[in-house]
């Protein structure tokens, strides 16, 4: 403690100050009133169990009532360092059915609703007093090839990876099938993250893909594709099956429950798989440490797909330790370009959080 409003944080790991601060900005590092929480600690849990049902933070609102899986009532925190908000209270209700959420909104019983889905939002477009906001989320969908699959050597062929980038109908998926709930994004850092590449160099071009395959001497290409049997994953997979066929690539879908797909990927039993990614914290390393790092021990995305990348490992470790913020972002931009140029991933789209 430096003074009543300043603390000094030190760490032993060789990581940049930016990463440390970004991790501290996540919910796991929330600041709470020690004098209030400490007496309620049990079994060395630092008051964690008590905090599940009580409020002791410094944010704009504090929890007044919490009913798990039903509702939470928050009231303005007059002692917040930023001052009390204009709203005196906020009620957040869990309403599982999207149609019911839409009805509550239309009747004026709710001021805001989230996760309504494309059909419900379409029904609300243009209605008086209704505004739809779309905000980029960090959710990304991608196609991954298991380079360690012994049954299909095509999965480890860089020429096939390159061709695959030109066989995804990005616009058809995002604009038509997913109705604007996602947008095309083709790098491992999502839009909104510092250092994210927002360029989309790849388009649906089966003729170009055929040229790449022919030049590499690849004949009758085919692979199986593991996918969760629910939207948006199965929707994306069906589009890929159709668009890859136009490039002469046969794709056999293996739809299953999410737990089954996850188990097969963890066991390295897949050839191709449609997967979703969400970062753990707001820093480039959260994604780079999984897509561009494989130490052979941890279950990173690169590791799960058998991609051995000793040089990229070094680049990832160098980026996490770089103290200069501008230089650090440049390192991540170069890594994204490397993965766009050659990697067993095809980054397809990024999600939108739609609020009505």
Range-by-range predicted roles:
Residues 1-40:
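Surface-exposed binding/hinge segments that line
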Residues 4-12, 59-60, 87-89, 138-185, ...:
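Alpha-helical secondary-structure segments
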Residues 7-9, 82-93, 219-225, 242-256, ...:
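A local structural motif
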Residues 99-109, 126-127, 159, 238-247, ...:
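Short helices/loops that flank or line small-molecule/ion binding pockets
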Residues 49, 77-123, 241, 250:
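Ligand-site clamp/hinge motif
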Residues 25-85, 89, 206-207, 211:
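Gly/Pro-rich hinge or "lid" segments in bacterial periplasmic/extracellular proteins
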Residues 61, 158, 183-215, 232-235:
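Structural transition elements
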Residues 67, 76-78, 141, 167-197, ...:
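Detector for C-terminal structural segments
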């Amino acid at each position: 403690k430096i003074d009543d409003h300043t603390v000094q944080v030190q760490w032993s790991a060789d990581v940049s100050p930016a990463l440390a601060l970004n991790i501290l900005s996540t919910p796991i590092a929330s600041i709470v009133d020690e004098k209030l929480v400490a007496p309620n600690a049990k079994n060395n849990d630092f008051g964690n169990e008590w905090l599940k049902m009580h409020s002791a933070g410094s944010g704009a609102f504090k929890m007044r009532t919490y009913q798990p899986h039903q509702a939470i009532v928050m009231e303005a925190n007059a002692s917040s360092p930023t001052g009390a908000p204009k709203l005196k209270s906020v009620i957040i209700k869990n309403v599982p059915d999207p149609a019911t959420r839409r009805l509550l909104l239309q009747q004026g019983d709710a001021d805001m609703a989230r996760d309504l889905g494309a059909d419900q939002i379409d029904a609300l477009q243009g209605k008086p007093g209704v505004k739809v906001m779309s905000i980029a989320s960090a959710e990304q969908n991608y196609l991954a090839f298991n380079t360690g699959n012994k049954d299909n050597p095509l999965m480890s062929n860089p020429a096939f990876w390159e061709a695959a980038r030109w066989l995804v109908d990005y616009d058809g998926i995002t604009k038509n099938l997913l109705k604007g709930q996602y947008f095309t994004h083709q790098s491992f850092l999502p839009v909104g993250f510092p250092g994210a590449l927002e360029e989309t160099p790849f388009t649906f071009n089966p003729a170009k893909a055929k040229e790449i395959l022919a030049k590499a001497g690849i004949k009758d290409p085919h692979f199986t594709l593991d996918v969760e049997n629910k939207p948006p994953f199965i929707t994306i997979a069906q589009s890929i099956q159709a668009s890859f066929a136009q490039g002469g690539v046969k794709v056999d879908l293996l739809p299953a429950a999410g737990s089954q797909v996850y188990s097969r990927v963890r066991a390295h039993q897949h050839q191709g798989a449609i997967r979703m990614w969400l970062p753990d914290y707001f820093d480039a390393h959260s994604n780079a440490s999984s897509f561009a790092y494989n130490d052979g021990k941890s279950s990173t995305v690169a590791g799960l797909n058998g991609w051995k990348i000793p040089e990229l490992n070094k680049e990832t470790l160098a980026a996490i330790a770089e103290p200069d913020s501008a230089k650090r972002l440049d390192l991540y931009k170069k890594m994204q370009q490397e993965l766009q140029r050659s990697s067993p991933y095809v980054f397809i789209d990024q999600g939108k959080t739609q609020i009505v």
